[in-house]
Amino acid sequence: PLMNDNFGGLAVGGTRITDPRLVFGGAGPVPLEAVIGPVTVSTDIALNNPTGPFNNLGIPGAKSFHLIAPGYGNLSNFPAAANPYAVRVTGNAPNASIVELAVAQIPTFFTLSEIGGNDVLGYATSGGDGSNLITDTATFDFALNTMVGAMVSTGAKGAIANLPNITSLSYFTTVPHNPVPLDAGTAAFLNSASAYGAYNAGIVQAFAFLVANTPMTQEMADAEIAKRTITFAEGEGNAVVIFDESLTDLTQINPALVSMRQATAADLVVLTAASFIGTEAIPGNAQTVNGVAIPLADKWVLTPEEQEEIATATTSYNASISAVASANGLALVDLNSVLVEASTTGINFDDYNLNTDLVFGGLVSLDGVHLTARGYALMANEFLKAIDATFGSNFEASGNMAKAADYPVTFSPLLP
């Protein structure tokens, strides 16, 4: 939504609620104020909202059902049931839903992009810790059909995009599972009976008990013992230790045997963990290093089981999107295939090859989730191609596609 300046950030009555934007700090993303010093956040949702109406009603963080909810942009409902970015666009109709704001403009054409993306994104960025659940398919389907039904009720045509697999984004692929360097002495201590050696011995004993007294087989026990055994070595490349609720609960046998293991390449460590791994839970106490002595909490890691939940929901949402596009004569934009290509081989856009590497890939912005201006230009072209194919327009044939060179991937910290 329209901001008052390029510093970014939001305030309510002078109190900051979101921070200014990220900038490139030479190696990776850093907060703007770390580069240029303190700035005043001038975009205040209680004081200076524009009145609209707006053609672009995309709301960061909005889930499918939020877009049909009355009052989602009413300041009096913030923060419990309103989104500050929605407050920016509701103007003189604060109780109108986002879809109602769109329909009120009596459009002849509309686009729906990434509907459902936030329904899985919140779960993913919180490491699947349960604080931000995936929207169930029935709720998503109701919201989707309500939106599309409202938009086509005036006779408007439109285009709708399916959802990419968000775990291919750099927010989930940048931080390695094994970033821990250790000297010989530290590695030896961690492997000793004073540290993880005791845990390793304990799980062997616990699984021996389970094999003897429950239906668990020795083969099953051996597989989980191997998964849970924690070892470190001198040098680079040691995996972080994580909590994993999918492991067998052994705490009733021995309270010290919590469900933890070392991460593997199949786990996805979230981008924000980069500044947390290696810090000390108790400053000055080297035996409280997060990710080594203290396992990473669920919010820092997406395990394979959690990734599967996201993939299942995304597949279900995409089936619904395809069905609603077909039923209503909408152009269907396959953004899922675009991200697959970008995250594997890279995707060509004019003279550039864009991929999902953080900062240097050119497609994904510094937050690791949203796209750069060039990335969004690429996606806009995919919409135009689908519109051409469905409605017989000639955006591509007439040369009226977005040009990659017109859209930068980073912006100067000094941009006013």
Name each model feature, range by range.
Residues 1-416:
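Conserved active-site regions of diverse hydrolases
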